[in-house]
Regions:
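Conserved N-terminal helical subregion
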Residues: 48-163
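Glycine-rich loop(s) and the adjacent beta-strand/alpha-helix scaffold that form part
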Residues: 161-172
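Proline-centered flexible-loop/turn and helix-kink motifs
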Residues: 24, 59, 230-234
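Conserved Rossmann-like nucleotide-cofactor binding loop
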Residues: 11, 15, 36, 139
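Conserved FAD/dinucleotide-binding core of flavoprotein oxidoreductases
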Residues: 86-89, 95, 171-250
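Glycine-rich FAD pyrophosphate-binding loop
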Residues: 18-41
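Beta1/beta-strand and adjacent pyrophosphate-binding region of the FAD-binding site
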Residues: 1-11
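A structural signal for isolated positions on well-ordered beta-strands in alpha/beta enzyme cores
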Residues: 4, 27-29, 113
Length: 252
């Protein structure tokens, strides 16, 4: 049995792991356009329920992930000068790059073939494959190419967001609501490893325009967010990595 997986992100790699475990004799190959250690963004977050599923379906990768993650039980909400902490909400954060390397190594252990810097633009090359898995991300070219078959519904939400990072340590999943002269901004922040945290900034389209963010470079946008959230960053810098402003798409 031949299985081709297009896309070597976390979803494609985890699919490869589970398929190879279920079909040990199958030839499973993952095709990824980027290099093995390329990654965009910063940390990813998992709930306790997701961790339970990781442990259930592949204990070896689960234990490696939990060896690397930052764990917290609280949500801290900063609103109008007050802080509300709510316990009992277990989450963990993990570096996206670390997660990819863990899953790559686990897939190799099982005998999965990983081909990097291999851009697939036509799935017809896999005509002999018994199964093709499309895991090429939220902007999947294959989903668009076969729109008539898959019939996806893409709802582009109105709010703008930018994904940044910081060296600011955090002890809780942190939400900050900050009112500015232009309108409200929200920061969603969490630590994913020692010395590193993810900061996702969100605002409505009207506030986005009034704040002059349209057309700004990534660094200029980071500088503006650092000014707005200065008291929460506490002197720590904001980091960028493809941190352009975009809209949340909901895909069904």
């Amino acid at each position: 049995m031949q299985i081709a997986i297009i896309g070597g992100g976390p979803a494609g790699l985890y699919a490869a792991i589970l398929l190879k475990k279920q079909r040990p004799k199958a030839e499973v190959t993952v095709y990824e356009r980027n290099r093995a250690d390329d990654t965009f963004g910063f940390g990813v977050v998992f709930s306790d329920a997701t961790l339970d599923n990781f442990e259930k379906y592949d204990p070896p990768s689960y234990h490696r992930i939990t060896d690397e993650f930052a764990y917290w039980d609280d949500i801290a909400i900063h609103f109008k000068g007050t802080v509300h902490r709510v316990g009992g909400n277990g989450f963990c954060g993990c570096s996206r790059r670390t997660l990819l390397l863990i899953l790559q190594n686990r897939a190799r252990e099982l005998g999965v073939h990983l081909l990097f810097e291999t851009d697939v633009d036509d799935e017809s090359r896999f005509i002999d494959a018994d199964l093709i898995v499309l895991a090429d991300g939220i902007n999947s070219r294959f989903r668009d190419k076969h729109r008539a078959h898959f019939e996806p519904e893409v709802d582009l939400r109105s709010n703008k967001f930018a994904w940044m990072g910081s060296t600011r340590p955090l002890d809780a999943f942190t939400f900050v609501f900050e009112e500015t002269e232009w309108g409200p901004f929200i920061a969603h922040a969490y630590q994913y490893e020692v010395g590193h945290s993810t900061w996702i900034f969100e605002t409505d389209p009207e506030t986005f325009k009034r704040a002059g963010l349209e057309g700004l470079s990534e660094q200029a946008s980071a500088d503006r967010m650092a000014e707005i959230f200065a008291k929460y960053l506490d002197g720590y810098p904001l980091l960028i990595n493809r941190s352009m402003w975009r809209n949340f798409p909901m895909i069904r």
